[in-house]
Amino acid sequence: MAASAVGIITLLAVVLAGPLAWAIATYVERRRKAADGAAEAGASEGQVDGKEPEREEMSGVAYTLSLLGYAIGLGNLWRFPYLVGKWGGGAFIIAYLVCLCFVAAPAYLIEMVMGQYTRKSTVGCFKMIHPRWDGLAYGQALILLMVMAYYNVLLAYAVIYIAGSLVDPLPWAADSKNYFNVEVLNGYDDYIGKGLGPVQWKLALGLLVVWLIVFASLSFGQKILTKVTWVTVVGPIVMLVVLLIRSVTLDGAADGIEFYIGKFDSEVLGDLDMWASACSQILFSLSPGFGAAITMSSHTRPKENVFRTCMVVVVCNSAFSLVGGFAIFSIVGNITFRLNAAGGVLDKATGAMVATTVAEQARAGTGLAFIAIADGMRAFGSGTNAMSVLFFTVLLTLGLDSTFCFAETFVCYVEDYLLVKGSKPAKWKIVGCTCAVMYLMGLLFCTRMGIELLDTIDHYCITYYLLLAVALEAFMFTFDFGWRRLVVHVKLATLGNLRTPLGQDVVPSFFWRLAIHITMPVCSLFLFFYILSTDVVEPYGGYPVWMNGIGWSCLAALLAVTPLGFARSLKSGTGSTLPPLEQDEAALAAAFGIKSTLPPLGQNEESDLAEGATA
């Protein structure tokens, strides 16, 4: 093996592209301000004249890109194909889309509206709606810590592959599955009598690189983060299209695609475990229940059309997963084709070489995306090293987008808490402490049993808590925020915009009300208790008892924090600090020239308001 000049040059180009783009953008912005005579450039930050500092605001494009980056993450290419393979193709996709429409999308919409309405991060938002819900906010802060601890280890895998792309020939050229299992993970063959094992230095070093990138990107506010997001959102979309175009032309790709969308087992649709997996996947991918959408929406402009942005993010996120599935399974089909052409795979029971199937290769586990994409790089011929650098950089940036939002949300928790206590330390200090603690926690997942621990925590934290969180958010919205307030706010916030001069209607009204008030909480709680009943009977994943014990302990911590707000609220007797709904209605009525209070907003809400506008 020798160093690949093409790979090194490509990596340098990728590394230098970001700072160069930032320098050019900064130069242009400074020249524009100088030409305009911007006097506010030297305005001081922090509190002025005893007033609370204004919240940083993002433009509409920056807001949309940030939410796209938050939603479109590594899980779209790491978790989604793995679950499709596990549950046999088309049936899982149907369940995924149903859960998207009736659980995840409604949860995402109400988080975005509540964030924009209150102009506060999750703790402040929930306290404003009613103090009894602040325990849910603290539970979401805790789950952010747990997810950040293991999620960035997946990005460390990408860092290792980027480093491997600088070698010619690629170190995984002979066997991509063996490279992932042995060279990257160095895991155990069995769990009997094993502990976590020693920390793997490659993973630890890769994890350090990831957290240094996060620290550099978050330490200096929304403006820097916005510029970074342009690269980390647009780049993966472009590279995914390139991978898709090349992968569908490979030998055996049709077999992989047929498994992906052509295979349908109606019996699987009756398996509640599959529905639980589908629901947890869309919740993990779109990520309502973490509170990040609330925090990001609190930074958007008051006149931003969050309903339209919600639709854009929901559609683009799912489209990315579905399109990515075509690319991944095309490569899996090609892997199957090549294995069979070479004589098949070894049957451990008989010791004979037997033919393999796409279904068998698709069950490669949580590393399916890394194995498939690594193997797919051989299809680019002389450009293998350059394309490998680019594609694994794409995987890295996909994960970084989500990590940025997770970390930014947690940092906002800390900033808001310290502000209440009368302290306002520099943001880089809070970010630095967060990154350091998360790196140390992440080392647990860099051990020889790290990926098994990762899978366990992912199951108990994500599957359980997100189901519970969205159900509780539905109750909070129904009893303390209200559908009418949402409709009035969206209408008032978008009134007079170029595309919505009469304001944005939340349509179809019947569907959204049905989903938020009924299907979202009922389905979430049903799946929560169903999974609980199965895990109590049989330990998850066949992992050791002590590992499942860690998972149960993490879940117990989350469940213990959540009801604290109810206890404090009952003791203190404090209530909601939301402004009266009549105040919002009066503002909307005044905007339409209606002197009296608006009639109930229902199916005829648009005609009511239009009539007032012409009065």
What are these regions (language model features)?
Residues E45-A62, T226-A407, V411-L443, L453, ...:
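Membrane-embedded translocation segments of transport machinery
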